[in-house]
Amino acid sequence: METVSKIDQQNQAKIWKQIYGFAESLVLKCAVQLEIAETLHNNVKPMSLSELASKLPVAQPVNEDRLFRIMRYLVHMELFKIDATTQKYSLAPPAKYLLRGWEKSMVDSILCINDKDFLAPWHHLGDGLTGNCDAFEKALGKSIWVYMSVNPEKNQLFNAAMACDTRLVTSALANECKSIFSDGISTLVDVGGGTGTAVKAISKAFPDIKCTIYDLPHVIADSPEIPNITKISGDMFKSIPSADAIFMKCILHDWNDDECIQILKRCKEALPKGGKVIIVDVVIDMDSTHPYAKIRLTLDLDMMLNTGGKERTKEEWKTLFDAAGFASHKVTQISAVQSVIEAYPY
């Protein structure tokens, strides 16, 4: 009888892990929906399985055998810990990002990305190799932009996830990139500013800057009123309000190269001499060993599936700026998945 070598076992194990790669995402979503992290956090002290089961915000009684198996998997994912002696559960360090109500919570991103509709395009990954239809449209019958405009619940879920990511990024911006916003900027337009999470943080950190949110009408209609922030609806492909700085966080990655060049040209038209575009977007580096290196590649596929856009390398960014007639640009890495790119048209 032929035996399987250790190397073959490792190779098979790698494929099995990838076959069930979805499991970690959906177990993570389950943990958020069950509020396991909040329950353990609010209890302060570690909890036994029975104690945890009795406090979960679900119909009682809880099937403790099934909860045990979910917790066993979550412990293996290193999100929670179990004491070998007391058999009581507590939070592992990454679990703090599963807690709601603080600026670095990742709960909204977890719920959105693992929503069945937003997962559906991934089942059409190969379909995009032929034809011009994006996987999102194949899966859900509409482009992502039309879909959002006619599905308010999904639009809110999506906006909450974008705000979640923006809070992570703006925390890094405020701490690491003050000079970018304090260098002769008195007015700033956040193009594609959504619900205003980014511009609110910018305005708080730099109160002398007059800030404006610019987005599509249905987005502006759902965005909250923010003190000292102006809201304008419109189409960035047609025009952009004038300002000393134009801020775009995760906007250009939604679009193909020709569309990005068009947007950048509208930016150039809106900027005075000395003005700049502040772009917060992924910069792919295939030689990087950074912890975010793989997620940046995942986001590239996500853009390909959902919008027909892409994440770009430094060389690809330079090509866009050159084609749009920009004079220079500078890339700054920050402690986030995205980098900051300052692009100067003059």
Curated annotation (Swiss-Prot):
Keyword Methyltransferase: yes
Enzyme Commission number: 2.1.1.128
InterPro entries on file: COMT-like (IPR016461), O_MeTrfase_dom (IPR001077), Plant_O-MeTrfase_dimerisation (IPR012967), SAM-dependent_MTases_sf (IPR029063), WH-like_DNA-bd_sf (IPR036388), WH_DNA-bd_sf (IPR036390)
Residues the entry annotates as binding substrate: D165, C250, I251, L252, H253, D254, D302
pH dependence: Optimum pH is 6.0-9.0.
Record keywords: Alkaloid metabolism, Methyltransferase, S-adenosyl-L-methionine, Transferase
Taxonomic source organism: Papaver somniferum (Opium poppy)
Protein purpose: Involved in the biosynthesis of (S)-coclaurine, the common precursor of all benzylisoquinoline alkaloids such as morphine, sanguinarine, codeine or papaverine. Catalyzes the transfer of a methyl group to norcoclaurine to form coclaurine. Methylates (R,S)-norcoclaurine, (R)-norprotosinomenine, (S)-norprotosinomenine and (R,S)-isoorientaline.
Protein name, UniProt field: (RS)-norcoclaurine 6-O-methyltransferase
Entry binding sites for S-adenosyl-L-methionine: M162, T166, G192, D215, D235, M236, K249
GO terms assigned for molecular function: (RS)-norcoclaurine 6-O-methyltransferase activity; identical protein binding; O-methyltransferase activity; protein dimerization activity
Temperature curve summary: Optimum temperature is 37-41 degrees Celsius.
